[in-house]
Amino acid sequence: MTPSVDSLLLGAAAAAAVVLGLGWLAHRVLLLGLKAPRVPHDCGPHDLGLPAASVRELSIAGMRGKRLFAWLVTPDVATAAPHPAVLVMHGWGSNAAMMLPVVAPLREAGFSVLLLDARCHGRSDDEDFASMPRFAEDIAAGLGVLRAQPGVDPGRIGLIGHSVGAAATLLHASRDPAVRAVVSISAFAHPGELMRAWLSRARIPYPVIGWAILRHVERTIGARFAAIAPLATVRRVGCPVLLVHGRHDATVPFSDAERLAAAAPHATLLAVDGDHDLRDALAPFTDELVAFLIAATRAPALADA
């Protein structure tokens, strides 16, 4: 869960600014700016001491013929069917291995866990660019496979995401009423606000130049920031949402989490003493996170309650 949001903003803003004068060539530069640095896995589920039979590597069919890498971790046979499952999505410039701290507690609680590499990340296929909507597309592809796994109850599925991955889980859940729970870790409230703050720090004036940069990024990713912003999508999510955020987050301010909590009809805010990368800071709250997912996937769906 390494924070790399600034690299996304830097690449997008710098490249898009050039687009204003250099056309096609500069647009190609923008696409490079919208690709995160690929970080290789430095560990895997087997390093957690799990039984070999409980871990499988999957190759999942994604959009536009791309293949997505994933690890599927299953619970003990005694609790294997039927049981809930969770898809876990990393953040920008990260990969599935960096989300491993949540795996063992979830497996012990009887969940199957799908750890997914988004396109342009980890061991998944490359693409012309990465974006939050494309993260959401990859989540949809992963869920299709997860729901079809033997023993998995397709009606008891939760999502966990970090940073851009958290925003993507909220975007997907706002469109998929079958999702039963979302754990959003270090999500930003609005991508446009995040980029405008970066433009201000870089002393790029918003009128004309900054505005044009943001509009070009929207055209490139095929979505308006206002439509995909967590501040908008969290209002449309019909399942319980746990918003986890570090009080000392220097990448996405804690106030973003407070705004999301105020906007969400079924949200709970969990504040932890940490920064944007919460792998270590989350350890004391693992039981709370697992309890939330157990309650949400056991209870009747909110839409049916």
Regions found by a protein language model. Name each.
Residues 275-286:
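Catalytic histidine-centered segment of alpha/beta-hydrolase-like enzymes
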Residues 236-238, 243-245, 249:
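Short beta-strand/loop motif that positions the catalytic acidic residue
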Residues 250-256, 281:
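Conserved alpha/beta-hydrolase "acid-adjacent" motif
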Residues 2-61, 71:
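An N-terminal hydrophobic leader/cap segment in hydrolases
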Residues 171-223, 232, 271:
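Hydrolase active-site cap/lid region
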Residues 151-162:
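Alpha/beta-hydrolase fold nucleophile elbow
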Residues 129-150:
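Alpha/beta-hydrolase active-site loop
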Residues 103-125:
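Conserved alpha/beta-hydrolase
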